[in-house]
Amino acid sequence: MSITAAQVNELRKVTGAGLMDCKKALTETGGDHEKAIDYLRTKGLAAASKKAGRAATEGLVGSYIHAGGKIGVLVEVNCETDFVAKNENFQAFVKDIAMHIAAASPLYVRREEVPAELIEREKAIYREKAKESGKPAAIIEKILDGQINKFFADICLLEQTYVKDPDKTIQTFLNETIASIGENMSIRRFAKFVLGEGLAKKESDFAAEVAAAVGQ
């Protein structure tokens, strides 16, 4: 049975589970929405949705430095209480997220943050490529949905495959941690710094150097 993007998105809204988890749940349950919710609950992936409405205003700004100080990451993860912010599991989660960001280089936390013009530009590129295949318009739109979801999975932190466990997304990892800790959590923002990024390196004029050496 073919699972549509609309089905996946609807299940995601209801449960708060990751897109890949929602798609798997729908596939395993033959596209039945209610059974898919139960499937996610049995896996502990929908538990976080019950806590999603609670304010998460405490938390921690974590950091990770890699490659001899050439790559650095700051990430803010929020929780509900200062007590949980001091919890070892919470702090380990923050560190793991910072390490993932250093390795995977996401651009945004969630797809809602991606500028509309960037999405439209990507859609236009994918649509033109699909048209060249000569496929019917309906098929092209399905291909387009898949390509855009892949685009989001590449640049959005919550939809990326977790580098330490390729079987789950960061959203799944977050949901599991929420279920384990018992408080709502949110990855608010992050920044990645790469030494020298954006700076133009001065290139020496080899001919001038030779001439100068000869003249000495």
UniProtKB/Swiss-Prot annotation:
Principal subcellular localisation of the protein: cytoplasm
Cited SUPFAM superfamilies: Elongation factor Ts (EF-Ts), dimerisation domain, UBA-like
InterPro entries in the record: EF-Ts_dimer_sf (IPR036402), Transl_elong_EFTs/EF1B (IPR001816), Transl_elong_EFTs/EF1B_dimer (IPR014039), Transl_elong_Ts_CS (IPR018101), UBA-like_sf (IPR009060)
Subcellular location: Cytoplasm
A UniProt-annotated Pfam family: EF_TS
Disulfide bond sites: none
Protein biosynthesis is among the record's keywords: yes
Any one GO CC term of the record: cytoplasm
Alphabetic keyword roster: Cytoplasm, Elongation factor, Protein biosynthesis
Chain spans, region Involved in Mg(2+) ion dislocation from EF-Tu: 81-84
Transit peptide in keyword set: no
Any one GO MF annotation of this record: translation elongation factor activity
CDD domains (alphabetical): UBA_EF-Ts
General function of this protein: Associates with the EF-Tu.GDP complex and induces the exchange of GDP to GTP. It remains bound to the aminoacyl-tRNA.EF-Tu.GTP complex up to the GTP hydrolysis stage on the ribosome.
UniProt similarity note: Belongs to the EF-Ts family.
Record NCBIfam families: tsf (TIGR00116)
Protein name: Elongation factor Ts
Organism name: Geobacter sp. (strain M21)
